[in-house]
Amino acid sequence: MADSSVFTTDLGAVTAYADAKAHGYTGTREEFATLLANAGNNLAEANAASAAAQASAAQAGQSANAAAASAKAAASAVGATFYGVEFTGSPSAGTRTGAAADFVFTPGTDTSAGQNDFDGVYPWAGMRRCCCTLNADGTVTVNAYKGQPGYIEDGTNGEVLVEVPLFYVSGMLDVNPRVSATPMPGFRAPRKFRNSDGSLKQRCYLPAFPGSIGNDGKLHSIAGVVSTGNKTISQFLAAARLWGETYSIGTSADFEVLAYLMIVAYGTRNVQAKMRGVSSLYATNIAVTGALTSEAAVIVAKGQLEPGMVISIGTGSENESVANRRIVTAIEAIEGDTANVKASFTGEAVTTTTDHKVWRIMQSTGTANSVISTCGSPVSNTDGKHSFVFYGCENPLYGNQWRFECDWKLIDGVPYYCDDPTKYQWSSADDYTKLGGLVLPGEGWAKNLQADERFPWLQITKEVGGSSGTHLADYFYINKSGTRIVRRGANSRDGGDAGAFYLNLTSGASWLWWTGSADLSIPG
């Protein structure tokens, strides 16, 4: 009899068996485990397994039903379990397909749970936060899952990651993206789930929080800190590699996992239409309306600041001469003053006067933890001032700060890709594959995507001519001269330009500013 342990180690198998039963399969769980084991990773392998399973069934005198439920039939039986969306023409919103046809996705807040039908199906239902030890060989040791003893997000019990169960995808993100918990003809496992030898991982890990470089020099994923800026792409990569040589910063493989899950769940290419993200928080020259001496606090008009916001104080604009990148911790009413409040913040005490100005920069990490649903933003999903969470990942793909992607770059307008995390660099084309078949357009609103068939997870803008409310609904910047690094998603001042498909390919490797950051990429 087949080993049914797959049902305790592979969440996708649980879903596949339940769905197959719902569609008429009458075999046992052990028989179905054999079918999945024989199914293989592509149609050719499935066909071979099918013949073997049918022959075995005949020899054993099993019922015609069991014989029909061969490897290929098993894949067909779960065919209705893909979740997809189809886009046609210029509207950013699409039509849900497959088992998601009647699904609803309404993000929640800190007071409303919204409605999200994807919470009940894999792979979304299997995503969970965990505290993890990052091993030098690239593997991950889970110390505690959220809700278990020992789970804490300050880094004292390891990095905070999101575990994602193995799933499969098909279609281009801008045309007909589909997600399935089980292998199906025409589907592939995302690059993030493939080992260097081609075998599959049963799970992968994403950072739960935007990247922050700690006192140890390493790039972290923890709550309650200011995500790092003002570093070059090489400096961020060096900080990630302190964990081990195969660690890096965000890649197209990380993007692929999140993008397929997000676009299918949202049902639109205009991700900001569902959750705006931190794209309109930025403000300078906020007046200091009262003086304070030697306090870790500042007095401002009511409504200007909230706990979790990152601020600096100086003489105006982005000056930080008084206080640098502090996190607002509390807002207190001032007795007898209905117009102003006292905002306390982290760090040492300072002296502020009414000659000073506050720079409201972005949100600190962990500021979406108050959301009571799997996806949503505290207070508002539409005001552009609050962090959002998507199945445990905070501010993924867009908003707050640009994110570097390190596995591809432009050289004189042509994309080059590297599949070896130990060889990312921006000084030459060595160890990179030239994607000469991808012709990139000039600057403009992105309309659609293209990919090299060898690297289908890397999908880049093909045409421009859209708008902020049509097609991909994100902007595309490019400089076709010299070597250009990849920035994705936009920052807290980019407004409607921001989004998962918002790319900036204009900067060289020496670029750095507070708006640029990087997330940790975990190989194991």
Each language-model region and where it sits:
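Acidic glycine-/aspartate-rich tracts in secreted/extracellular proteins
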Residues: 25, 167-169, 211-213, 317-318, ...
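N-terminal module-boundary/linker segments of secreted carbohydrate-active enzymes
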Residues: 76-186
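Short aromatic-cysteine micro-motif
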Residues: 155-158, 187-320, 330-397
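Short catalytic/ligand-binding loop motif for oxyanion handling, primarily in non-cytosolic enzymes
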Residues: 171-172, 214, 256-259, 411-414
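Compact beta-rich and alpha/beta scaffold cores in large eukaryotic transport/transcription complexes
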Residues: 334-346, 406-437
